[in-house]
Amino acid sequence: MPRTKGGTVTRARRKKIMKLAKGYRGSKHLQFKAASTQVFVSRKYAFRDRKKRKSEFRKLWIARINAAARQNGLSYSKLMHGLKVAGIDMNRKMLADIAYNDEKTFADLADAAKKALN
């Protein structure tokens, strides 16, 4: 029985990796070994950063809320506590969007938080 070398299977597997490595710099888009290593690392980074993105957006929202709160004479923590006491249940994403796009509405929310604290 003749030996099966698997040329088409190997070619397809390598072609798939090389297609994923398109746009990489240097030998990483030309040589299979370098490309497969880089694709592996890139996928590792993509997995890690999909998790990281959530905390980075939360940090951004908190920074925006804090800046807007300080313009209205409150710290971030006092604003959040005041909103909770006032019974205003808004998540940080919504608050950050209001702080960024609609200063008057955010000022009204800050006033409600101040009243609830006093």
From Swiss-Prot:
InterPro entries per UniProt: Ribosomal_bL20, RIBOSOMAL_L20_CS, Ribosomal_protein_bL20_C
GO MF annotations, alphabetized: rRNA binding; structural constituent of ribosome
Signal peptide residue numbers: none
UniProt entry keywords in alphabetical sequence: Ribonucleoprotein, Ribosomal protein, RNA-binding, rRNA-binding
Pfam families on file: Ribosomal_L20 (PF00453)
Ribosomal protein among keywords: yes
Cystine pairs: none
Keyword rRNA-binding: yes
Family annotation (PROSITE patterns): RIBOSOMAL_L20 (PS00937)
GO cellular component: ribonucleoprotein complex; ribosome
Membership in a protein family: Belongs to the bacterial ribosomal protein bL20 family.
Family matches, as HAMAP family: Ribosomal_bL20 (MF_00382)
Role description: Binds directly to 23S ribosomal RNA and is necessary for the in vitro assembly process of the 50S ribosomal subunit. It is not involved in the protein synthesizing functions of that subunit.
Annotated protein name in UniProt: Large ribosomal subunit protein bL20
Species assigned in the record: Lactobacillus johnsonii (strain CNCM I-12250 / La1 / NCC 533)
Protein encoded by which gene: rplT
